Amino acid sequence: AAFALSGLMEAARKRLDAVGVCVVAFLAAFGGGTLRDLLLDQRPFFWVQHTEMLWGVLALCVMAMLFMRQRHFEVTEKAILWPDALGLGLFTATGVHHALQALMPGVVAVLMGLITGVFGGVLRDMVCNEIPTAFKDHRPYAVCAFAGGWTYVGLWFTDAPGWVALLACLVVTVGLRALALWRNWQLPAWRA
């Protein structure tokens, strides 16, 4: 729901129609996990197995569109940052978990977490005709997911309970992203 909300808000900011809003919300919610499933050769895709996720995102889209129209809600870029940070943490943890369950090495699991966490937002931005925030915003984004992913892997290999690894990954990822936004941390830009 967190990434779907960020997709929905970005689509609303771009003033897309109802179909466009739903498409962008679905891409943001399921794009990274679908790419992960493709790379891990897992079929059917997670959202095909769990159709309640599809219904949940659709319900979120309908409710949000009704709420935003009735309230004349203006979506700012800042409003998108927090649902996006939460989605980044949740999806990173989920991606790492799926890869470890598929018996992938730690480094592959971290990369699958990174892909799951980042690429839904990349697809969201591309469809909205933007350079993906993950690539242009010099405040750490993928780096936060990378650190959170390694936190999960480290706890996994010390036989910590799964919920502890998931929660730690979430806290590290979202916490680092929040610090990066609050303190305006910047990664160096590539100079040609």
Model segments located where?
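Structural signature of hydrophobic alpha-helical transmembrane segments
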Residues: 1, 45-59, 105-118
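The first (N-terminal) embedded transmembrane alpha-helix
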Residues: 1-6, 19, 23-27, 147-148
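C-terminal ends of transmembrane helices
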Residues: 4-14, 37-38, 63-77, 122-133, ...
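Short, structured motif recognition centered on aromatic/hydrophobic residues
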Residues: 23-27, 34-40, 111, 115, ...
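Small-residue-rich segments of transmembrane alpha-helices in multi-pass membrane proteins
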Residues: 24-33, 81-97, 139-153
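Helix-coil boundary and interhelical linker segments in multi-pass alpha-helical membrane proteins
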Residues: 38-48, 94-108, 153-165
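Ordered, amphipathic secondary-structure segments that act as subunit-interaction surfaces
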Residues: 59-98
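Small-residue-rich transmembrane alpha-helices that serve as helix-helix interface/gating elements
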Residues: 115, 165-179
